[in-house]
């Protein structure tokens, strides 16, 4: 395992601790993306994010990986802080593995956290809008159903 793979693996481990303890063996052990979509998305997204943060910073790849991960955490009803806390976990992992976090990487991590927060809020807004629309639809149906019986 090279240094970048070790960083990703440690970042995945740290991020998995945000899930309930009883799910950790499954999330960390099951590799099948169909049986464990959460673990698969987490591994794939964090690997892409680490590659881009430590490399070229391709905004499109970052946005795609971040969207998959943050959307999943928004649906799982993480609080805003808990949903994006994984981003700051990379800083701790870098400190553990290399003993230092370059200023340029710290800035990239901060930028990623802001992007993650924006994405989380956008996802939560979409969820809220879906719920409101569903309630409106139910109300219309209930009202129209009552009118037909009168």
Language model segments and positions:
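Core of compact, soluble alpha-helical bundle domains
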Residues: 1-68, 99-150
């Amino acid at each position: 395992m090279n240094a970048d793979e070790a960083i990703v693996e440690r970042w995945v481990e740290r991020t998995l601790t945000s899930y309930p303890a009883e799910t950790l063996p499954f999330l960390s052990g099951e590799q099948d993306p169909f049986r464990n979509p959460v673990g698969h998305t987490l591994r794939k997204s964090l690997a892409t994010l680490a590659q881009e943060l430590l490399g070229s910073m391709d905004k499109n790849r970052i946005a795609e990986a971040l969207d998959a991960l943050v959307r999943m955490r928004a649906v799982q009803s993480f609080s805003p802080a808990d949903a994006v806390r994984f981003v700051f976990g990379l800083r701790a992992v870098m400190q553990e593995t290399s003993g230092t976090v370059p200023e340029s990487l710290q800035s990239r991590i901060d930028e990623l956290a802001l992007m993650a927060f924006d994405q989380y809020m956008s996802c939560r807004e979409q969820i809220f809008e879906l719920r409101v629309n569903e309630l409106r639809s139910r109300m219309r149906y209930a009202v129209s159903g009552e009118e037909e019986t009168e």
